[in-house]
Amino acid sequence: MHPCRRSLPFPLNCQLVKVGTADYGGASDQSDQQLDCALDLMRRLPPQQIEKNLSDLIDLVPSLCEDLLSSVDQPLKIARDKVVGKDYLLCDYNRDGDSYRSPWSNKYDPPLEDGAMPSARLRKLEVEANNAFDQYRDLYFEGGVSSVYLWDLDHGFAGVILIKKAGDGSKKIKGCWDSIHVVEVQEKSSGRTAHYKLTSTVMLWLQTNKSGSGTMNLGGSLTRQMEKDETVSDCSPHIANIGRLVEDMENKIRSTLNEIYFGKTKDIVNGLRSVQTFADKSKQEALKNDLVEALKRKQQC
């Protein structure tokens, strides 16, 4: 692991702000171009190898360390809360130094006395959100692990909803779904409405290894954003509003992955490999052409 990874004080998804830097012209342009190329490369590499590829890129260009770590989402890792005996997910949003906070017990592991904590009001909301998304995960994914972390902002709060579902390798199929939903909530002065900004990233990979078709890897990541104003009331609290946004976003991303990415891959594979013999395929094409010609003649009459 690269030495700079443990020293970063900011989350992986936050944006770095450059203050008081001099304009070095060509050097700055070259650095920006290197970062663009590195990010473009990471988008095209398998999600299950993100950590290794990210480490290799940082070793090649150490000056991009902070920019890459703040821009590239990494697969979620699972830890066990020894206090309550439940699993939770690790990310930079529940990390303080080398310790990670569990959403279930609100304790850091390894123990940390002065670790960052949400306010009492937000902690209560965090507990309710974890219970709600635990049920959501069980209904939609039938397993896996989920975690929700919230933190205070000046005019509202922000949070991250994490969901991870890994395949068990049965039927010679391996895979993993990692979704990271970062939401920012700006509460209006009236207290009756709020502005929600959601940024969602899904990393998905599948690997099959069957004697009939051989080994096939398929994976990628997709990021989408949306903003929406919602009414806040007893009938429609923050958790319900955020839950609907996350549910709609995951359905859209899942549909996009299924129809575009997997559908396109299926078309490509079917174009390269066919279960039909060439003779049968030629007969089918000839029959289709005959039907088209017959319909044209019928329309002309």
Curated annotation (Swiss-Prot):
Belongs to the F-actin-capping protein beta subunit family. The isoform beta-3 is predominantly expressed in the testis. It is only detected in total sperm, sperm heads and the calyx fraction, but not in sperm tails or any supernatant fraction. Weaker expression also found in brain. The modification N6-acetyllysine is found at residue 264. It comes from the Eukaryota. F-actin-capping proteins bind in a Ca(2+)-independent manner to the fast growing ends of actin filaments (barbed end) thereby blocking the exchange of subunits at these ends. Unlike other capping proteins (such as gelsolin and severin), these proteins do not sever actin filaments. Plays a role in the regulation of cell morphology and cytoskeletal organization. Forms, with CAPZB, the barbed end of the fast growing ends of actin filaments in the dynactin complex and stabilizes dynactin structure. GO terms for cellular component: brush border; cortical cytoskeleton; cytoskeletal calyx; F-actin capping protein complex; hippocampal mossy fiber to CA3 synapse; lamellipodium; membrane; postsynaptic density. Keywords: Acetylation, Actin capping, Actin-binding, Cytoplasm, Cytoskeleton, Phosphoprotein. Pfam families: F_actin_cap_B. The modification Phosphoserine is found at residue 31. One of its GO terms (molecular function) is actin filament binding. It comes from Bos taurus (Bovine). This is F-actin-capping protein subunit beta. GO terms for biological process: actin polymerization or depolymerization; barbed-end actin filament capping; cell morphogenesis; cytoskeleton organization; lamellipodium assembly; negative regulation of filopodium assembly; regulation of cell morphogenesis; regulation of lamellipodium assembly. Component of the F-actin capping complex, composed of a heterodimer of an alpha and a beta subunit. Subunit of dynactin, a multiprotein complex part of a tripartite complex with dynein and a adapter, such as BICDL1, BICD2 or HOOK3. The dynactin complex is built around ACTR1A/ACTB filament and consists of an actin-related filament composed of a shoulder domain, a pointed end and a barbed end. Its length is defined by its flexible shoulder domain. The soulder is composed of 2 DCTN1 subunits, 4 DCTN2 and 2 DCTN3. It is found in: Cytoplasm, Cytoskeleton; Cytoplasm, Cytoskeleton, Perinuclear theca, Calyx.
